[in-house]
């Protein structure tokens, strides 16, 4: 079972000057925040995605993760996050999902985002299985 979806990640990190970025104001607000996180709530009609899942046999949550990654990949701000007291620019995104592990607990799993759905699906299945079994 998969759950909450968050976006972050990157393999190559570059520290940037916050005052020279479009994230300067957000960085200043988040710098001393106890939990620097933003949560969006929105009701979405996922009927077409559910039909696609049933028609293709692809997991619904994987499709949701891919759609969120696809939307986020076009927004520059998602690549830049505060880390400690630094502002870091990442080279790629990953979608973080919560996986029910074999001990009936929850574990976090990062799936590197790929615009190619078949590659994202392979990574999703392999990584969520690995995380599920490793606890």
Per-region residue spans from a language model:
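Short, Lys/Arg-enriched N-terminal segments with co-localized hydrophobic residues
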Residues: 2-12
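Acyl activation and transfer enzymes in specialized metabolism, enriched
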Residues: 49-75
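Helical lid/core segments from catalytic subdomains that handle acyl or acyl-like groups
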Residues: 101-135
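N-terminal beta-alpha "docking/capping" segments at the starts of catalytic domains
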Residues: 10-53, 58
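Small-residue-rich loop/turn and linker elements
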Residues: 78-110, 114
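Short secondary-structure capping/junction motifs at helix and strand boundaries
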Residues: 75-82, 133-135
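Generic structural motif
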Residues: 43-49, 71, 100-103, 114
């Amino acid at each position: 079972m998969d759950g909450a979806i968050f976006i972050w990640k990157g393999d190559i990190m570059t520290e940037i000057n916050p005052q020279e970025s479009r994230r300067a104001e957000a960085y200043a607000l988040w710098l001393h925040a106890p939990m620097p996180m933003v949560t969006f709530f929105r009701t979405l009609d996922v009927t077409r995605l559910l039909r696609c899942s049933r028609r293709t046999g692809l997991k619904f949550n994987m499709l949701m993760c891919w759609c969120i990654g696809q939307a986020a990949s076009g927004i520059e701000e998602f690549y830049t996050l505060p880390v400690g007291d630094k502002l870091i620019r990442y080279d790629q995104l990953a979608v973080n999902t919560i996986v029910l592990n074999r001990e009936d607990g929850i574990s976090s799993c990062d799936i590197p985002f790929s615009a190619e759905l078949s590659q994202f699906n392979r990574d999703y299945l392999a990584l969520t299985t690995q995380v599920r079994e490793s606890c």
